[in-house]
């Protein structure tokens, strides 16, 4: 009986070409494993395609709820945004994919896991760090780094290789973007996006929605309810977090919400350009941020922003299965204890407009914040505070004046 390799399989061009390549260069049975994290109709026809390409078996692991509850929600609660723009759509999906690949490898008694990430990208790092953390004894095969046997250097080469092995491709891969999709987002790279000087062809590339210019002229309002930092209802209707994201994707896409054109710094050192659509996620993150502004005290909110940035870096770099991520998440969980309330928003041509926020744990006190005189705050108290708060500035100014006088 042959040993087995588990291939992280999407049915796209790269992983389709890898199946015959593995059979040619390794004496393994190829078991494909597709992890369903909400990519929708991209799963159609996968089993037939995998077997026609030479795989012995295909697993489709449906883990959308697990992905959202255990990976997306911690990022939402942390306010994790990479380089001020990227909501980590691809990054946060990689650890759950690595985890499921390892589980299938153990079930099949496989000796190796293979992935189709290129040698220039982030995903090779994310997949392999996850696999090493969970199953250090498993061999990892990365075809794009196998220079002696992987001779394909472009999508065109892969297309010709597939044709030579009698594999019919269900798409025109030579004229398509490189995309990654899950419930949280879809990314687009390649074609005109390779040159940052080019404007994105939004009419051609957008999948989840429209550009703001083509959004309706009438705004639409919604409300989101949170409990301990987690969304639990949309417009008053109780729903799972995954269902809320799905609904918000439709609403946000309709109004051109969450489209970013970004040049980001990859883990491997180079810059890359892509267009990302995250309509539902953008709405959810904005609502969560607005609720926190009402509830968290100044010191905690300030520290949490720093932790959120670090959390984003850790997730982006593929370090999910580390003590550092666990420690950061533990801090975040404490901050979310009272992040409960309702946020009202209006969507209009790419904009998310605040319409009011309420919480039983709000620290906003109108009697204190109002410009009118109240019992809880005496305007004259500010004088002593300012004298103490500005004491160091006053002392330095006095010293500098003394220095200048003695010159």
Swiss-Prot record:
UniProt entry keywords in alphabetical sequence: Amino-acid biosynthesis, Arginine biosynthesis, ATP-binding, Cytoplasm, Ligase, Nucleotide-binding
EC number of this enzyme: 6.3.4.5
GO biological process, one term: L-arginine biosynthetic process
Class of enzymatic activity (EC top level): ligase
UniProt pathway annotation: Amino-acid biosynthesis; L-arginine biosynthesis; L-arginine from L-ornithine and carbamoyl phosphate: step 2/3
PROSITE patterns per record: ARGININOSUCCIN_SYN_1, ARGININOSUCCIN_SYN_2
GO molecular function terms listed in the Swiss-Prot or TrEMBL record: argininosuccinate synthase activity; ATP binding
Subcellular location: Cytoplasm
GO CC annotation terms, alphabetical: cytoplasm
Record: residues binding L-citrulline: 86, 91, 122, 126, 178, 187, 264, 276
NCBIfam families reported for this sequence: argG, PRK00509.1
Protein name in the entry: Argininosuccinate synthase
Gene source species: Lachnoclostridium phytofermentans (strain ATCC 700394 / DSM 18823 / ISDg)
């Amino acid at each position: 009986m042959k040993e087995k390799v588990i291939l992280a399989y999407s049915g796209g061009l790269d992983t389709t070409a890898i199946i015959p390549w593995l059979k040619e260069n390794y004496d393994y049975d190829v078991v494909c494993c597709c992890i369903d994290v909400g990519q929708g109709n991209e799963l159609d026809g996968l089993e037939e395609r995998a077997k026609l390409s030479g795989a012995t078996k295909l697993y489709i692991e449906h883990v959308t709820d697990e992905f959202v509850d255990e990976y997306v929600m911690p990022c939402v609660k942390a306010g994790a945004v990479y380089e001020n723009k990227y909501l980590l759509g691809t990054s946060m999906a990689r650890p759950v994919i690595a985890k499921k690949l390892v589980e299938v490898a153990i079930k099949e008694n496989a000796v190796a896991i293979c992935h189709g990430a290129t040698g220039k990208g982030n995903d090779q790092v994310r997949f392999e760090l996850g696999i090493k953390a969970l199953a250090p004894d498993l061999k990892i095969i990365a075809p794009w780094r196998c220079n002696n046997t992987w001779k394909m250097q472009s999508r065109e080469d892969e297309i010709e290789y597939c044709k030579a092995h009698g594999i019919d491709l269900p798409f025109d891969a030579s004229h398509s973007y490189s995309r990654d999709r899950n419930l949280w987002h879809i990314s687009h790279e390649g074609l005109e996006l390779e040159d940052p000087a080019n404007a994105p062809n939004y009419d051609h590339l957008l999948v989840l929605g429209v550009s703001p210019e083509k959004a309706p002229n009438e705004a639409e309002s919604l409300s989101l309810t949170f409990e301990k930092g987690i969304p639990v209802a949309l417009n008053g209707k109780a729903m799972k977090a995954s269902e809320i994201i799905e609904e918000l994707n439709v609403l946000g896409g309709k109004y051109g919400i969450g489209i970013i054109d970004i040049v980001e710094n990859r883990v491997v050192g180079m810059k890359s350009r892509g267009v990302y659509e995250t309509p539902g996620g953008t709405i959810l993150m904005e609502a969560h941020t607005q609720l926190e502004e009402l509830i968290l005290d100044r010191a905690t909110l300030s520290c949490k922003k720093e932790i959120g940035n670090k959390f984003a870096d850790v997730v982006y770099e593929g370090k999910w299965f580390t003590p550092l991520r666990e420690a950061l998440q533990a801090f975040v969980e404490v901050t979310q204890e009272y992040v409960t309330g309702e946020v009202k928003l209006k969507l209009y041509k790419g904009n998310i407009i605040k319409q009011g926020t309420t919480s039983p744990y709000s620290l906003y006190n109108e009697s204190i914040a109002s410009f009118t005189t109240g019992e809880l705050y005496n305007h004259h108290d500010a004088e002593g505070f300012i004298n103490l708060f500005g004491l160091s500035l006053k002392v330095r100014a006095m010293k500098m004046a003394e220095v200048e006088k003695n010159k």
